[in-house]
Amino acid sequence: MVKIKMPALFRRRSGSKSPPLPQADPASGGGSPAPTPEEEMERVFRKFDANGDGRISRSELGALFESLGHAATDDELARMMAEADADGDGFISLDEFAALNATASGDAAAVEEDLRHAFRVFDADGNGTISAAELARVLHGLGEKATVQQCRRMIEGVDQNGDGLISFEEFKVMMAGGGSFAKIA
């Protein structure tokens, strides 16, 4: 999410929004219906809102990126907060968070750039593919309980060439909802 460029999550462009998160595979055994987009947005927001006060602070934002292994600089955090904090109160509310993550389609080049940033978060070793271990690392950083074996099964749902890894092209299909994959946040 950060390279340390601004993550797609907080990139605001006129006419361009981030792509939707993939839906969980009902066949994966969850048994409950997939959450609505609003429920999923609130769940992701709560991951960021570590102290549960209903708003995301700069320190909570920084802590989340650090837990993902992508510590943001003070300047990057300030820029993300400035772009996200529409009312200027120094915090990101659920409404501000939702506005930044609206799922309307946007400029294809901007979406591609956002996907590349997200892919790099998962591809820790920079080899151009996402392994089960790399997926598990990111999920753990987000507070999700997933074993490497479970991540291998998730990868099988989108691994078009059968190599046990997710390439960028496979990642794009997954993020567009064209494959089955557990939610990432």
Curated annotation (Swiss-Prot):
In this chain, the stretch annotated as Disordered covers 1-41
Q: Which UniProt keywords apply?
A: Calcium, Metal-binding, Repeat
EF-hand domain mapped to chain residues: 36-71, 72-107, 110-145, 146-181
Binding locations of Ca(2+) 2: D85, D87, D89, E96
SUPFAM superfamilies in UniProt: EF-hand
The positions annotated for binding Ca(2+) 3 are D123, D125, N127, T129, E134
Bilayer-spanning residue ranges: none
* Gene3D superfamilies, per database record: EF-hand (1.10.238.10)
Query: Which InterPro entries has this protein been placed in?
Result: EF-hand-dom_pair (IPR011992), EF_Hand_1_Ca_BS (IPR018247), EF_hand_dom (IPR002048), EF_hand_pair_protein_CML-like (IPR039647)
Task: Supply one GO molecular-function term.
Answer: calcium ion binding
Report if keyword Metal-binding is assigned: yes
What are the binding positions for Ca(2+) 1 in this chain? D49, N51, D53, R55, E60
Q: Binding positions for Ca(2+) 4?
A: D159, N161, D163, E170
Determine the domain of life of the protein's source: Eukaryota
Protein's job: Potential calcium sensor.
Quote the protein name from its UniProt record.
Probable calcium-binding protein CML10
